[in-house]
Amino acid sequence: RRQRQMCIRDSSIVGVVILLCILVFRNVDLGIHAPQSLLSLSAIFLILTFGPKAANLLGAFGGLLINFVCIWILMVLGCHNVIYYNHSTLVLGYLLLFGYDASGSAYTMRLFAMLFGFILTGVVFWRNHRKKTYKRGLRDLFNEFNLHSSRSRWQLLMASAVSSVIFIASILNLPRAMWAGIAAMSVLLPFRTDIKKHVCGRIPGNLLGGLIFFLIFPHLPAGLYSVVGIVGGIGVGFSASYGWQAVFNSLGAMMIAVSVIGFPQAVFFRIAQNIFGSLYALCFEKIFHTVTERKLESKI
Protein backbone atom coordinates (compact mmCIF):
# COMPACT_ATOMS: atom_id res chain seq x y z
CA ARG A 1 0.00 0.00 0.00
CA ARG A 2 2.87 2.37 0.87
CA GLN A 3 4.50 1.69 -2.51
CA ARG A 4 1.22 2.46 -4.25
CA GLN A 5 0.92 5.74 -2.33
CA MET A 6 4.46 6.68 -3.35
CA CYS A 7 3.69 5.97 -7.02
CA ILE A 8 0.55 8.11 -6.83
CA ARG A 9 2.49 10.89 -5.12
CA ASP A 10 5.26 10.77 -7.74
CA SER A 11 2.71 10.85 -10.56
CA SER A 12 1.06 13.87 -8.95
CA ILE A 13 4.38 15.73 -8.63
CA VAL A 14 5.36 15.05 -12.25
CA GLY A 15 1.88 16.07 -13.35
CA VAL A 16 2.17 19.36 -11.48
CA VAL A 17 5.55 20.12 -13.08
CA ILE A 18 4.27 19.36 -16.59
CA LEU A 19 1.08 21.37 -16.07
CA LEU A 20 3.09 24.35 -14.84
CA CYS A 21 5.31 24.18 -17.93
CA ILE A 22 2.32 24.02 -20.28
CA LEU A 23 0.56 26.93 -18.57
CA VAL A 24 3.70 29.08 -18.66
CA PHE A 25 4.89 28.32 -22.19
CA ARG A 26 1.39 28.68 -23.56
CA ASN A 27 1.79 32.43 -23.05
CA VAL A 28 5.54 32.98 -22.75
CA ASP A 29 8.26 32.39 -25.34
CA LEU A 30 11.99 31.99 -24.67
CA GLY A 31 13.07 35.12 -26.49
CA ILE A 32 14.97 33.32 -29.27
CA HIS A 33 14.36 32.00 -32.80
CA ALA A 34 11.36 29.62 -32.62
CA PRO A 35 13.05 26.41 -33.94
CA GLN A 36 15.95 26.94 -31.55
CA SER A 37 13.44 27.55 -28.76
CA LEU A 38 12.40 23.91 -29.15
CA LEU A 39 16.04 22.89 -28.69
CA SER A 40 16.16 25.02 -25.57
CA LEU A 41 12.91 23.48 -24.35
CA SER A 42 14.28 19.97 -24.92
CA ALA A 43 17.39 20.88 -22.89
CA ILE A 44 15.15 22.18 -20.10
CA PHE A 45 13.17 18.94 -19.96
CA LEU A 46 16.36 16.85 -20.08
CA ILE A 47 17.65 18.74 -17.05
CA LEU A 48 14.34 18.37 -15.22
CA THR A 49 14.33 14.64 -15.97
CA PHE A 50 17.92 13.66 -15.18
CA GLY A 51 19.38 16.48 -13.08
CA PRO A 52 17.43 15.88 -9.85
CA LYS A 53 18.08 12.13 -10.04
CA ALA A 54 21.83 12.65 -10.53
CA ALA A 55 21.94 15.09 -7.60
CA ASN A 56 20.24 12.56 -5.32
CA LEU A 57 22.54 9.73 -6.42
CA LEU A 58 25.75 11.71 -5.84
CA GLY A 59 25.00 12.79 -2.27
CA ALA A 60 25.41 16.22 -0.69
CA PHE A 61 28.77 17.21 -2.20
CA GLY A 62 28.14 15.85 -5.68
CA GLY A 63 24.60 17.18 -5.51
CA LEU A 64 25.92 20.66 -4.78
CA LEU A 65 27.74 20.73 -8.12
CA ILE A 66 24.91 19.09 -10.08
CA ASN A 67 22.26 21.37 -8.60
CA PHE A 68 24.34 24.49 -9.25
CA VAL A 69 25.03 23.62 -12.90
CA CYS A 70 21.47 22.48 -13.63
CA ILE A 71 19.79 25.47 -11.99
CA TRP A 72 22.18 27.90 -13.68
CA ILE A 73 21.46 26.38 -17.12
CA LEU A 74 17.71 26.49 -16.43
CA MET A 75 18.04 30.15 -15.51
CA VAL A 76 20.01 31.01 -18.65
CA LEU A 77 17.79 29.03 -21.02
CA GLY A 78 14.42 29.86 -19.54
CA CYS A 79 14.74 33.16 -17.68
CA HIS A 80 16.25 35.53 -20.25
CA ASN A 81 13.30 37.89 -19.94
CA VAL A 82 13.17 38.43 -16.19
CA ILE A 83 9.72 40.03 -16.09
CA TYR A 84 8.11 36.67 -16.91
CA TYR A 85 9.37 35.14 -13.62
CA ASN A 86 9.94 31.79 -15.36
CA HIS A 87 12.22 30.72 -12.51
CA SER A 88 9.13 30.20 -10.37
CA THR A 89 8.18 27.38 -12.75
CA LEU A 90 11.49 25.93 -13.94
CA VAL A 91 13.49 26.02 -10.71
CA LEU A 92 10.44 25.08 -8.67
CA GLY A 93 9.84 22.10 -10.97
CA TYR A 94 13.47 21.04 -10.62
CA LEU A 95 13.32 21.25 -6.82
CA LEU A 96 10.05 19.31 -6.63
CA LEU A 97 11.50 16.50 -8.74
CA PHE A 98 14.65 16.60 -6.59
CA GLY A 99 12.71 16.48 -3.33
CA TYR A 100 10.35 13.73 -4.45
CA ASP A 101 12.93 11.31 -5.79
CA ALA A 102 11.88 8.15 -7.61
CA SER A 103 13.66 4.87 -8.28
CA GLY A 104 13.07 1.57 -10.03
CA SER A 105 9.81 1.25 -11.91
CA ALA A 106 8.59 4.58 -10.52
CA TYR A 107 11.53 6.36 -12.15
CA THR A 108 10.91 4.52 -15.41
CA MET A 109 7.35 5.81 -15.35
CA ARG A 110 8.70 9.27 -14.59
CA LEU A 111 10.87 9.10 -17.72
CA PHE A 112 7.87 8.30 -19.91
CA ALA A 113 5.79 10.99 -18.21
CA MET A 114 8.46 13.63 -18.75
CA LEU A 115 8.82 12.62 -22.40
CA PHE A 116 5.06 12.99 -22.84
CA GLY A 117 5.20 16.31 -21.00
CA PHE A 118 7.93 17.59 -23.30
CA ILE A 119 5.98 16.62 -26.41
CA LEU A 120 2.80 18.22 -25.10
CA THR A 121 4.57 21.39 -23.98
CA GLY A 122 6.46 21.56 -27.29
CA VAL A 123 3.25 21.29 -29.30
CA VAL A 124 1.59 24.05 -27.27
CA PHE A 125 4.72 26.21 -27.48
CA TRP A 126 5.11 25.80 -31.25
CA ARG A 127 1.43 26.42 -31.92
CA ASN A 128 1.44 29.68 -29.97
CA HIS A 129 4.89 31.11 -30.73
CA ARG A 130 6.07 29.76 -34.10
CA LYS A 131 5.29 33.04 -35.90
CA LYS A 132 7.35 35.20 -33.57
CA THR A 133 10.68 36.28 -35.00
CA TYR A 134 13.91 36.87 -33.11
CA LYS A 135 17.44 37.40 -34.36
CA ARG A 136 18.77 35.95 -31.12
CA GLY A 137 19.62 32.23 -31.12
CA LEU A 138 20.31 29.62 -28.47
CA ARG A 139 24.04 30.35 -28.39
CA ASP A 140 23.36 34.04 -27.78
CA LEU A 141 21.74 33.25 -24.43
CA PHE A 142 25.11 32.06 -23.14
CA ASN A 143 27.14 34.67 -25.04
CA GLU A 144 25.11 37.42 -23.37
CA PHE A 145 25.91 36.12 -19.89
CA ASN A 146 28.00 38.86 -18.29
CA LEU A 147 28.42 39.82 -14.65
CA HIS A 148 28.04 43.48 -15.61
CA SER A 149 24.42 42.59 -16.39
CA SER A 150 21.96 42.57 -13.48
CA ARG A 151 20.12 39.69 -15.16
CA SER A 152 23.25 37.54 -15.32
CA ARG A 153 24.10 38.31 -11.69
CA TRP A 154 20.57 37.30 -10.67
CA GLN A 155 20.86 34.04 -12.62
CA LEU A 156 24.16 33.23 -10.93
CA LEU A 157 22.79 34.30 -7.54
CA MET A 158 19.83 31.96 -7.90
CA ALA A 159 21.98 28.96 -8.81
CA SER A 160 24.50 29.67 -6.04
CA ALA A 161 22.03 30.37 -3.24
CA VAL A 162 19.58 27.55 -3.95
CA SER A 163 22.22 24.86 -4.47
CA SER A 164 24.19 25.91 -1.38
CA VAL A 165 21.18 26.11 0.95
CA ILE A 166 20.13 22.60 -0.12
CA PHE A 167 23.71 21.44 0.48
CA ILE A 168 23.73 22.87 4.01
CA ALA A 169 20.32 21.39 4.82
CA SER A 170 21.50 18.02 3.49
CA ILE A 171 24.73 17.84 5.50
CA LEU A 172 22.75 18.82 8.60
CA ASN A 173 20.42 15.88 7.83
CA LEU A 174 17.35 18.12 7.86
CA PRO A 175 14.31 16.37 6.36
CA ARG A 176 12.88 17.83 3.14
CA ALA A 177 15.97 19.85 2.18
CA MET A 178 14.10 20.98 -0.94
CA TRP A 179 11.89 23.16 1.28
CA ALA A 180 14.87 25.37 2.11
CA GLY A 181 15.69 25.54 -1.60
CA ILE A 182 12.13 26.44 -2.57
CA ALA A 183 12.04 29.13 0.13
CA ALA A 184 15.27 30.66 -1.18
CA MET A 185 14.08 30.45 -4.79
CA SER A 186 10.77 32.10 -3.94
CA VAL A 187 12.26 35.18 -2.30
CA LEU A 188 15.20 35.72 -4.69
CA LEU A 189 13.42 37.89 -7.21
CA PRO A 190 15.14 39.65 -10.14
CA PHE A 191 14.36 43.02 -8.56
CA ARG A 192 16.29 43.47 -5.32
CA THR A 193 13.77 45.84 -3.76
CA ASP A 194 11.17 43.04 -3.67
CA ILE A 195 13.29 40.44 -1.85
CA LYS A 196 12.88 41.69 1.72
CA LYS A 197 9.12 42.11 1.19
CA HIS A 198 8.82 38.47 0.13
CA VAL A 199 10.87 37.28 3.10
CA CYS A 200 8.56 39.23 5.41
CA GLY A 201 5.58 37.56 3.73
CA ARG A 202 6.88 34.00 3.50
CA ILE A 203 7.97 33.49 7.11
CA PRO A 204 4.71 34.65 8.80
CA GLY A 205 2.73 32.86 6.09
CA ASN A 206 4.38 29.53 6.86
CA LEU A 207 4.01 30.08 10.60
CA LEU A 208 0.27 30.66 10.18
CA GLY A 209 -0.07 27.75 7.75
CA GLY A 210 1.77 25.48 10.17
CA LEU A 211 -0.47 26.54 13.04
CA ILE A 212 -3.63 25.89 11.01
CA PHE A 213 -2.37 22.47 9.92
CA PHE A 214 -1.30 21.59 13.47
CA LEU A 215 -4.78 22.36 14.75
CA ILE A 216 -6.86 20.63 12.06
CA PHE A 217 -4.82 17.54 11.15
CA PRO A 218 -5.43 15.50 14.36
CA HIS A 219 -9.20 15.88 13.86
CA LEU A 220 -9.24 15.23 10.11
CA PRO A 221 -10.66 11.89 8.84
CA ALA A 222 -8.21 9.96 6.65
CA GLY A 223 -10.62 10.17 3.75
CA LEU A 224 -10.26 13.95 3.68
CA TYR A 225 -6.46 14.08 3.60
CA SER A 226 -6.40 14.62 -0.16
CA VAL A 227 -8.83 17.52 0.19
CA VAL A 228 -6.24 19.54 2.12
CA GLY A 229 -3.99 19.84 -0.93
CA ILE A 230 -6.96 20.82 -3.12
CA VAL A 231 -8.07 23.49 -0.65
CA GLY A 232 -4.50 24.75 -0.49
CA GLY A 233 -4.29 25.00 -4.28
CA ILE A 234 -7.59 26.85 -4.52
CA GLY A 235 -6.50 29.16 -1.72
CA VAL A 236 -3.28 30.03 -3.55
CA GLY A 237 -5.27 30.91 -6.65
CA PHE A 238 -7.52 33.29 -4.74
CA SER A 239 -4.80 34.82 -2.56
CA ALA A 240 -4.23 38.51 -3.14
CA SER A 241 -0.87 38.66 -1.38
CA TYR A 242 2.32 36.59 -1.29
CA GLY A 243 1.90 36.02 2.45
CA TRP A 244 -1.46 34.30 2.00
CA GLN A 245 -0.07 32.26 -0.87
CA ALA A 246 2.58 30.99 1.56
CA VAL A 247 -0.15 30.03 4.03
CA PHE A 248 -2.09 27.89 1.55
CA ASN A 249 1.03 26.49 -0.14
CA SER A 250 2.22 25.12 3.18
CA LEU A 251 -0.96 23.09 3.74
CA GLY A 252 -0.48 20.79 0.74
CA ALA A 253 3.26 20.49 1.36
CA MET A 254 2.77 19.39 4.97
CA MET A 255 0.03 16.97 4.00
CA ILE A 256 2.43 15.16 1.67
CA ALA A 257 5.27 15.32 4.19
CA VAL A 258 3.20 13.69 6.95
CA SER A 259 3.26 10.41 5.02
CA VAL A 260 7.07 10.59 4.89
CA ILE A 261 8.29 12.10 8.17
CA GLY A 262 5.13 11.97 10.29
CA PHE A 263 3.14 14.42 12.37
CA PRO A 264 3.99 16.85 14.01
CA GLN A 265 7.51 16.63 12.52
CA ALA A 266 6.18 17.77 9.14
CA VAL A 267 4.90 21.00 10.70
CA PHE A 268 8.11 21.73 12.60
CA PHE A 269 10.46 21.10 9.70
CA ARG A 270 8.27 22.94 7.20
CA ILE A 271 8.42 26.06 9.34
CA ALA A 272 12.10 25.65 10.24
CA GLN A 273 13.22 25.02 6.66
CA ASN A 274 11.29 28.00 5.34
CA ILE A 275 12.69 30.36 7.96
CA PHE A 276 16.18 29.02 7.31
CA GLY A 277 15.87 29.17 3.52
CA SER A 278 14.35 32.66 3.47
CA LEU A 279 16.86 34.23 5.87
CA TYR A 280 19.75 32.43 4.20
CA ALA A 281 18.70 33.81 0.82
CA LEU A 282 18.39 37.33 2.23
CA CYS A 283 21.90 37.21 3.74
CA PHE A 284 23.40 35.42 0.73
CA GLU A 285 21.98 38.03 -1.63
CA LYS A 286 23.57 40.89 0.31
CA ILE A 287 26.97 39.18 0.48
CA PHE A 288 26.81 38.09 -3.16
CA HIS A 289 26.11 41.58 -4.48
CA THR A 290 28.69 43.17 -2.19
CA VAL A 291 31.40 40.80 -3.44
CA THR A 292 30.46 41.00 -7.13
CA GLU A 293 30.17 44.80 -7.08
CA ARG A 294 33.60 45.15 -5.49
CA LYS A 295 35.13 42.82 -8.06
CA LEU A 296 33.51 44.70 -10.91
CA GLU A 297 34.67 48.05 -9.51
CA SER A 298 38.24 46.75 -9.13
CA LYS A 299 38.32 45.90 -12.85
CA ILE A 300 37.28 49.37 -13.95
Regions found by a protein language model. Give the residues of each.
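Transmembrane alpha-helical segments of multi-pass membrane transport proteins and ion-pumping complexes
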Residues: 1, 40-53, 67-76, 114-126, ...
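Short, small-residue-biased leader/transition segments that mark boundaries at the very start
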Residues: 3-8
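Hydrophobic alpha-helical transmembrane segments
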Residues: 9-15, 55-66, 101-109, 148-154, ...
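Pore- and pathway-forming membrane helices of multi-pass small-molecule/ion transporters and channels
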Residues: 11-29, 44-45, 64-103, 118, ...
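Membrane-interface helix-loop-helix junctions at boundaries between adjacent transmembrane segments
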Residues: 52-143, 147
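Membrane-interface capping segments at transmembrane-helix boundaries
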Residues: 126-136, 286-299
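Membrane-water interface at loop-to-transmembrane-helix junctions
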Residues: 142-167
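Transmembrane helical segments that form the transport core of multi-pass membrane transport proteins
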Residues: 163-217
